[in-house]
Each structure stands twice: as C-alpha cells, then as structure tokens.
Amino acid sequence: MVCIKSSCVVKPSEPTPNVKLFLPESDQVKPWTHAPVFFVYQPEVDNSVSTSLENLKFSLSRALVPYYPLAGRLNGIGGGRFELHCNTMGAVIIEAESDARLEDFGDFRPTSETTKLAPYVDYAKDVSELPLLLVQLTRFKCGGIGIGIAMSHIVSDGKGAFGFITTWAKINRGEKGIIEPFHDRTAFYKGDPTAKPRCDHVELKGYPVLLGNKSAKEERAKETTTRMLNLSKNQVDKLKEKSNLGKPKDYVGREYSRFEAMSGHIWRCASKARRHENEQLTSLRITIDCRNRLRPPLPPRYSGNATMVTTSIAESGELLSNPLGLGFVCSVIRKCIDKVDDDYIKSATDFLISQDDLTPYRSGFHNVGSTEGVFLGNPNLAITSWVGLPINDVDFGWGKPIYMGPTALGYDGKLLIIPGKDDGSVIVPIRLQVAHIDDFEKFFYEDI
C-alpha cells in the first residue's frame, strides 16, 4: 500500500522566459499523456525522508531554471495541436510512504501496484491544467527509495527527458557545470503544408487488423497483462549470430545489430504466440532517434521530441517459415530503419503539417486501457529501445539505481528494450493479451 503524505508545487528558483514555445510536428504527434518511469535506490545509510524531500525540492527548483519549459502548461490551438506556454506554473512533487519492501515487487514488472509508485495524473482535467512534470518520492519499509517521474510525452522524448533527469540528479548531488539544454523547436524541420509526401509512410496510413475484422475494436477490448523478460549478454549475442547466419549469400552490407536481432526475434515469437494465419499482415513499429539523421543535425542537447516512427509490415507466415529464418526478418527491419533519412523525416513532417486535425495520427497513450489514438496491438507490435540512455547516471546521491523501468505499459503489443546491469544484458517489459502471453514467453526463450 502506498500512502500519499504531502504534495506541493515547485517553481523555478530564478526568473525564466515567459514565452509561448512553438511545437513542431515531431512534438505534436506524440501523446500528451505522461510517460511514467521510476528509479529504485537502496541507500547505504539511512536517509531521512524529510531531508531527502527538501533536498529534492531545492534541486528541482534549480533544475527548472535551465529546463523552464517543464514548469509550463500546454494550450490547445485547434486541429489537435498545442503550444507550450512557459508560464512558471510549476512542477508537482509528492511525498509518499509504502508499507512494502522492495523485494515485494519482484522483478518490478508494470502492474497496478507499480503504477502507484509514479505520480497520479487526473486526466479528467483539461490539458491546460495538467502539470507537464510530476515527481513522487516513495520511502519503502526496508529503507529503499523510489523516485517516480511522470513527464508529458508531447514536450520531450527519452533522450530529452534524461537530459533533464541527469541534470536534476547532478544538482541534487551538489555538483556544478550544468550543460544548458537547447529548447528552440524551430531547429526541427517545421514542414511545408503545400509539399506532397515523397516517401511511402506506412505508419501514417493505418495498421493491419486481424483477417476477417473490419477494425481493431474487438482486439482493443481484450484483457491484457505484462511480463518482464530477461536476456543475458550470451543470449543476445546468440540471437545476433543467428540473424547474421541467415543473411543472403550475396549480402554485402553491415552485420545485423543486436537491436535488429532482438526485434526480429520478438516479432516472430509474437506472431507465433498469437497463432496468426499465414496470410495475416503484421507490423512492427520502431521508434527512431532522428537527431543525427536530419540535415543539418539537431544540437546534441535538443530537449524536445526528435523521434519518429517507422513501420515494417510482413505476412506472419513469411516471418515464421522463410528459409533464412531470423535473418530474413532482420532484413525486413533493416530496410525499414535505413529508409529514415533526412528526406523521409521531412516528407513525413510535410504530410502531418498538411492535416487539418492531427488527432487521428496521435498514438501511444500511456494510460492502460485507453481507447484514444491508433491501436498498435494484435496483430501488431510497437517497440522502443532505451539502450543508450544514461540510466546509471541518475544518481541523486544514493548511488546508482538498482532498477529503472516503466510503471505502466499502456496497450497490447507495447514493449521496451532496457539495458540491464553493465554486462550487456537487457530487460524486455511487454504487454500482451492474456491469451497470448504464456506462449510468447515460452517461445521467447525456447527459440533463441
């Protein structure tokens, strides 16, 4: 049980610009719901909750000076679009206690209990009333500490969010030398509403539905659950080796990556567990960081959303029975990733900015069971990799986190790839339908 003890608003400790920040289509198409994550710490010495809370409030107020947009609010401007008013309304910080021990949460898979470790956001309120950043400090019975963070996805992607979180942690440790973030969203291509798309943007046309169904309504209503799966470095390396053994004889490109091998393996296991017919179209939606794919590249400390999605589509039968096996699936994924270049990004942006209403194109809402946005569940998957994010740098003074992950996964088919310990292992939190999850886990390990 988690008991909320107090809550307060934290504002920047110094005056900050009172401006309305333009949000490009790369921001606009993201969900305005909050991505909930939490960090778990086991301090070596006993920490007073009140002292930790006061320190966090102070350091947060200082961190909100360079990251002043997070103290603002969204305002609707029509057409399913928003602007970001940097009005210093502030972030919210919450103090909580739990009568549980860290070991009671097992592998920390996203459940109704872990959801309570991140701040609750009341989506019954108008978007303009919602803080963009909420934080929850939870002290556990065993002395462990949890920091739950909920940040509106429409203002930042994972890399931008971690820029803020690591800055805040650094300030809380008493360190100096903060690197200033880059907030000017006009650096991302603004788009030309008169230009016609030059590429085939599968993800903007809609996603496959089950054969015999006219829509995803029936699948969206089915019960889902989560699992937390683990791959050792040896298992990941084995998948990579397996994928590269399946390359065509005339293939001359670079080796398939760990990410491509894991993604292909997961896609095959899902199609198998879902018992798709051979002719069933299935898609794998992948989130791509575009910072270095745009021309010119974005500044390294760009704080907004610089990701776009790209989608692979294939028949389930071919994924499972092609003679090249995992190598074939990786070739499909490779083509999907490699096409995301400067022209592809700008073509997608031109399409989005030409739409009168962006609402039909917004997806990935974080609240479990949401009926909003594009459905990415059966027969589809949506994958995001957090490998490469500086998770172990989030040290508030209690040492490195012993765990970091999501408190919730919003929908069927959603999964993450999270780095494990500093040994090349990974953790895969995934949400699937109850009818499919056991078989998926079985194939996930058996088919390596």
Curated annotation (Swiss-Prot):
<keyword id="KW-0012">Acyltransferase</keyword>
<comment type="function">
    <text>Catalyzes the formation of cimicifugic acids. Uses hydroxycinnamoyl-CoA thioesters as hydroxycinnamoyl donor substrates. Has a strict specificity for piscidic acid as an acceptor substrate as none of the various other acceptors tested including 4-hydroxyphenyllactic acid, malate, spermidine or tetrahydroxyhexanedioic acid are substrates. Donor substrates include 4-coumaroyl-CoA, caffeoyl-CoA, sinapoyl-CoA and feruloyl-CoA. No activity with cinnamoyl-CoA, isoferuloyl-CoA, 3,4-dimethoxycinnamoyl-CoA or 3,4-dihydroxybenzoyl-CoA as donors.</text>
</comment>
<dbReference type="GO" id="GO:0050734">
    <property type="term" value="F:hydroxycinnamoyltransferase activity"/>
</dbReference>
<dbReference type="GO" id="GO:0009820">
    <property type="term" value="P:alkaloid metabolic process"/>
</dbReference>
<protein>
    <recommendedName>
        <fullName>Hydroxycinnamoyl-CoA:piscidic acid hydroxycinnamoyltransferase</fullName>
        <ecNumber>2.3.1.-</ecNumber>
    </recommendedName>
</protein>
<feature type="active site" description="Proton acceptor">
    <location>
        <position position="153"/>
    </location>
</feature>
<feature type="active site" description="Proton acceptor">
    <location>
        <position position="395"/>
    </location>
</feature>
<comment type="pathway">
    <text>Phenylpropanoid metabolism.</text>
</comment>
<keyword id="KW-0808">Transferase</keyword>
<dbReference type="InterPro" id="IPR023213">
    <property type="entry name" value="CAT-like_dom_sf"/>
</dbReference>
<dbReference type="Pfam" id="PF02458">
    <property type="entry name" value="Transferase"/>
</dbReference>
<dbReference type="GO" id="GO:0009751">
    <property type="term" value="P:response to salicylic acid"/>
</dbReference>
<dbReference type="GO" id="GO:0009411">
    <property type="term" value="P:response to UV"/>
</dbReference>
<dbReference type="InterPro" id="IPR050317">
    <property type="entry name" value="Plant_Fungal_Acyltransferase"/>
</dbReference>
<comment type="similarity">
    <text>Belongs to the plant acyltransferase family.</text>
</comment>
<dbReference type="GO" id="GO:0009698">
    <property type="term" value="P:phenylpropanoid metabolic process"/>
</dbReference>
<keyword id="KW-0017">Alkaloid metabolism</keyword>
<dbReference type="GO" id="GO:0009753">
    <property type="term" value="P:response to jasmonic acid"/>
</dbReference>
